[in-house]
């Protein structure tokens, strides 16, 4: 009966203050800390009042973190059911699970001895000129690195005149002058953090990003020396190192909030954070706190994510706030390859997977290309092609890597049977193909262009030998300077234009903890984000002020370089590159701006056909600007009735048309003009095409920097985008014990005793939903209650091993009788139940059932 009185007290109190909102987990890939919650209080509710409320509510809880700027706390309760009731506690505004963010995934390559050409990323962005001509270094700017810590002893972080870096809180002679370890080495996201204050990095990621922001390895004489000199974007910034990850594993979102608050209180001008997860929605505590900090004058950049192989709608949530910067990755100009030299030309190659070791053939062996009567290269699929050229002993046979008739395994076997000592495969399309090959035969794949050069050289002198390099060298690769394949596609769940901007993130050489080798190359949007952070620092120093984060984002976006993919004649979608590749030099020199810095046209139902922009002349003199529309690639994001966005959206030459109220506009110095744009949707009839482009204002003055803003939209009614993966039979019921799934597709009819056998629900979502519900109906289809399934994020198409990523939920037979858990859960009596999955359509009001995609599962019998 004690319970009843608790309920009464909650209900009485709840009538005074409206109940809070319990948020579902919207990260398709993240885990949660069991029974841990982040709660936000209503404005004006003090921590003491809130704790009184929690206590009267009889929730037994422990405080994990108390926050100050974010009005709330994180707590642990005894059971999941206690947590779900939190939303009804007076004074509570929002309740979230504590999500565990993965340590950002990067591709790591060991840095090889290279030459100075490889410091190419600053040429792409104007940062080299800012360093050399304008002497900008980010001096005086404070940058918070919320990450795995920083190896502060690294010589690349040494203060001027010192040979070694150091960390001292508020220390004048250390570049790492702020920071804290919130977690300890053994923390993995799920266990209890053991803060120790020392932000030394044992994982490596934070040291790498810190080096990109402002490491200086130009003149290092101590060991280990960098494989080549390099410098970060802003080599005199002061760092705060806020360590939120242990040596491995993830980090709880409540730790991240604490780190963000401390970074702000330490006076950081900019924080840079990149956290995994493909939420695509901004209603999470991190994004909310980020917005608050930005409104107080701090800037924040977050990684767009490395989910480029998962189709559209996959941007990570850290950069999704209205004022935060979501950063896409561009490939560096150069990549490192072993190479052959033939006729004096260096040709990068990639070795076959089956051979998988360096090729150490003598440098005296000639080539024998397999040619047809016209001199064209044959595919090497027919053994007769080999017998036609005579003995291949001590020779390198050359064939075309066309996969129509055979793969590299078949081609390699033929070469081996014919007695060849090695094989060179000429790629038949862009890039250097990867080869499966055969064990025992050295097989190397080269680009098509190099293959053609090789044949031309061979035609002149058949005796030329191939030599094989021992080292790697830098080569301009096919996608050099263009958006990285791995970089995630937007838009966000609300169809806003994200990512915002791009920066070099593919193949970036930077610092690494000394204990782990000191330097390495890494790739990821994690590498692009700190580049933007460093760019902020240079911009702030150039303007001798602390402009609002919004102003800097706008300046960087307005002046970025709009880019094309490799060999493409058209511009890459703004849903992939944002406003383009950052050009900090142009941002500093520009004498114009366009507000807002992105145009969200939304879908056909909510289409913004008329949009006003403000073009400002920030220079001293009158300037005439010409406005034009520069279309970018359209993306076909769905095919047929498939629930899943396409892994690789198909590029379509389709775009909106734009007319301007004025195509030419003369603006006096310091003044602005309002220009009205009229948009028309593209004519295409493909399914939910995502189209985009750029509105560009070009000044008449020769050499003056043009400014632009990206626009993005989706044609069609976004409410009709399918959400649940019914194509592949999900959601489906499975058989579980209390902790694990035992049979993922048990025979019909399902009977569960809730002692040994529990029903489990396996689901998979191909699109985000603003709200998901799981209802339980009895045998007469009457609503019994709701299951707090708590998951509404989109899953990636597959994990790293190619397996589908699934949501699995083991049901203990309990339901909440109201949707927002204002009463304790009940266990359903024995009987037959139908479980209904309901996902709210994007951009709908959320009326049930009209605005939901609904899937009724086969009945479940509870014995
Ligand atoms: C809680 O649920 C009740 C009944 O389902 C509903 O009337 C009320 O509006 C909900 N409150 C909130 C804050 O969602
Ligand atoms: C900076 O952002 C990158 C990418 O998001 C992230 O991996 C890294 O942890 C962040 N480091 C800083 C500077 O906070
Ligand atoms: C989707 O399926 C419906 C019904 O089967 C069919 O009428 C429609 O043409 C399909 N749409 C596409 C784009 O394939
Ligand atoms: C549930 O099944 C898993 C896998 O078969 C097993 O490891 C675990 O011990 C079982 N748990 C219980 C509570 O029986």
Where are these regions (language model features)?
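Beta-sheet-dominated interaction scaffolds and their linkers
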Residues: 481-488, 572, 581-623, 662-664, ...
């Amino acid at each position: 009966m004690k319970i009843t009185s608790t309920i009464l007290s909650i209900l009485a109190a709840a009538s005074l203050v409206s109940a809070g909102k319990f948020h579902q987990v919207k990260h398709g890939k993240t885990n949660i800390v069991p029974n841990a919650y982040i709660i936000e209080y209503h404005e004006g509710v003090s921590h003491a009042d809130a704790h009184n409320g929690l206590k009267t509510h009889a929730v037994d809880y422990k405080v994990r973190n108390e926050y100050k700027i974010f009005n709330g706390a994180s707590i642990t309760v005894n059971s999941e059911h206690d947590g779900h009731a939190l939303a009804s506690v007076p004074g509570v505004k929002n309740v979230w699970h504590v999500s565990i963010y993965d340590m950002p995934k990067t591709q790591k390559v060991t840095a090889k001895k290279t030459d100075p050409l490889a410091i190419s990323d600053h040429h792409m962005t104007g940062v080299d000129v800012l360093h050399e001509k304008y002497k900008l270094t980010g001096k005086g700017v404070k940058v918070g690195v919320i990450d795995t810590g920083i190896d502060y002893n690294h010589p690349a972080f040494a203060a001027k005149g010192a040979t070694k870096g150091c960390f001292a809180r508020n220390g004048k002679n250390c570049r790492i002058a702020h920071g804290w370890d919130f977690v300890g080495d053994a923390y993995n996201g799920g266990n209890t953090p053991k803060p120790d204050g020392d932000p030394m990095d044992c994982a490596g990621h934070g040291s790498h990003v810190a080096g990109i922001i402002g490491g200086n390895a130009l003149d290092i004489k101590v060991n280990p020396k960098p494989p080549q000199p390099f410098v970060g974007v802003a080599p005199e910034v002061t760092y705060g190192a806020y360590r939120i990850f242990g040596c491995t594993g993830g980090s709880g979102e409540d730790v991240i909030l604490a780190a963000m608050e401390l970074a702000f209180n330490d006076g950081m001008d900019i924080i840079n954070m990149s956290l995994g997860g493909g939420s695509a929605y901004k209603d999470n505590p991190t994004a909310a706190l980020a917005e608050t900090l930005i409104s107080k004058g701090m800037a924040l950049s977050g990684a767009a994510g490395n989910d480029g192989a998962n189709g559209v709608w996959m941007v990570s949530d850290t950069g999704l706030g209205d004022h935060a910067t979501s950063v896409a990755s561009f490939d560096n100009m150069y990549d490192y390859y072993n190479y052959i030299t033939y006729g004096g030309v260096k040709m990068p190659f990639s070795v076959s997977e089956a051979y998988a070791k360096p090729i150490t053939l003598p440098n005296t062996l000639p080539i024998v290309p397999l040619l047809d009567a016209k001199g064209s290269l044959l595919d090497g699929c027919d053994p007769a092609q080999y017998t036609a050229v005579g003995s291949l002993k001590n020779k390198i046979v050359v064939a075309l890597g066309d996969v129509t008739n055979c793969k590299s395994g078949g081609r390699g076997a033929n070469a081996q049977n014919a007695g060849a000592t090695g094989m060179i495969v000429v790629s038949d399309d862009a890039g250097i193909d990867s080869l499966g090959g055969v064990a025992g035969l050295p097989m190397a794949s080269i680009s098509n262009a190099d293959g053609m050069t090789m044949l031309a050289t061979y035609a002149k002198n058949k005796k030329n030998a191939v030599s094989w390099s021992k080292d790697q060298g830098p080569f301009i690769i096919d996608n050099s300077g263009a958006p990285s394949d791995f970089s995630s596609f937007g838009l966000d769940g609300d169809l806003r234009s994200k990512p915002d901007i791009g920066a070099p993130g593919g193949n970036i050489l930077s610092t690494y903890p000394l204990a782990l080798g000191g330097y390495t190359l890494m790739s990821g949007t994690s590498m692009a984000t700190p580049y933007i952070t460093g760019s902020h620092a240079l911009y702030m120093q150039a303007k001798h002020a602390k402009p609002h984060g919004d102003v800097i984002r706008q300046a960087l976006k307005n002046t970025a370089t709009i880019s094309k993919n490799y060999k493409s004649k058209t511009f890459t979608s703004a849903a992939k590159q944002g406003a383009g590749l950052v050009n900090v030099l142009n941002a500093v020199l520009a004498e114009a701006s366009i507000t807002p810095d992105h145009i969200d046209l939304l879908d056909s139902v909510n289409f913004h056909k008329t949009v006003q922009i403000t073009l400002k002349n920030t220079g001293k003199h009158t300037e005439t600007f010409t406005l034009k529309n520069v279309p970018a690639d359209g993306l076909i994001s769905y095919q047929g009735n498939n629930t899943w966005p396409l892994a690789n959206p198909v590029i379509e030459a389709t775009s909106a048309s734009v007319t301007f109220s004025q195509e030419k506009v003369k603006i006096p110095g310091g003044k602005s003009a309002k220009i009205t744009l009229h948009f028309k949707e593209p004519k295409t009839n493909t399914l939910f095409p995502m189209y985009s482009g750029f509105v560009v204002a070009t000044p008449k003055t020769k050499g003056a920097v043009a400014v632009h803003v990206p626009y993005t939209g989706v044609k069609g009614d976004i409410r009709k985008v399918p959400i649940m993966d019914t194509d592949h039979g999900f959601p489906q019921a499975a058989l579980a014990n209390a902790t694990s799934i035992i049979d993922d597709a048990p025979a019909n009819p399902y009977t569960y005793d809730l002692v040994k056998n529990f029903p489990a629900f396996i689901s998979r979502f191909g699109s985000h939903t603003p709200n998901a519900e799981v209802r339980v109906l009895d045998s007469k289809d009457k609503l019994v209650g709701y299951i707090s399934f708590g998951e509404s994020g989109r899953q990636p198409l597959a994990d790293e091993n190619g397996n589908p990523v699934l949501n699995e939920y083991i049901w203990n037979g309990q339901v909440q009788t109201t949707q927002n858990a204002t009463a304790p859960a009940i266990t359903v009596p024995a009987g037959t139940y139908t479980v209904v999955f309901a996902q709210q359509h994007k951009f709908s009001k959320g009326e049930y059932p009209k605005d939901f995609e609904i899937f009724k599962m086969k009945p479940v019998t509870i014995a």
